[in-house]
């Protein structure tokens, strides 16, 4: 399926999506997430962009690592497809909400072309809690397999329970 043909969450409500999400699973190929207890916190800015704060605990250093960026819809008519930018020199990253119920789970997909030679696909299963029920995890993997072709064995369970609380 071509990247532009991937169905996204219909009637996406960005305000309901705001708040804290915990990473439950991620693609194995994501090199910049090496910590535990990974979280994403989204807040709506006055200009309708989204402040993105990603945090992960680094157990070897016993510190929280964080990065902040800004997300905006690629197209106002398709608010579930966002572009996220963390560094001014870096092109924005692709962020597509394939599915969310806003209160429990979010299935997020990203695709990027590398030098127009090949595409890199990535996915995340996010939850409002750190450890989602198995039925929701299975539902998320089914969405990935049916819509993007990513299979369960291309994902890692995000390690949890090693970090001191920040809240």
Regions found by a protein language model. Give the residues of each.
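A beta-rich soluble binding module of mature secreted/lumenal proteins
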Residues: 1-167
């Amino acid at each position: 399926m071509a990247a532009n043909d991937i169905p996204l969450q219909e009637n996406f409500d960005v305000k309901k999506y705001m708040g804290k999400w915990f990473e439950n699973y991620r693609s194995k190929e994501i090199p910049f997430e090496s910590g535990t207890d990974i979280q994403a916190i989204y807040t709506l800015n006055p200009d309708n962009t989204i402040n993105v704060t990603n945090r992960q605990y680094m157990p070897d250093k016993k510190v929280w690592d964080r990065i902040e960026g800004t997300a905006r819809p690629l197209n106002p008519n398709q608010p579930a497809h966002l572009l996220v930018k963390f560094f001014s020199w870096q092109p924005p990253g692709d962020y597509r909400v394939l599915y969310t119920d806003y209160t429990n789970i979010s299935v997020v997909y990203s695709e990027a072309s590398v030098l127009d030679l090949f595409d890199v696909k990535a996915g995340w299963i996010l939850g409002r809690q750190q450890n989602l029920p198995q039925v929701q995890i299975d539902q998320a993997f089914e969405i990935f397999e049916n819509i993007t072709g990513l299979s369960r064995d291309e994902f890692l369970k995000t390690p949890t329970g090693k970090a001191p609380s920040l809240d």
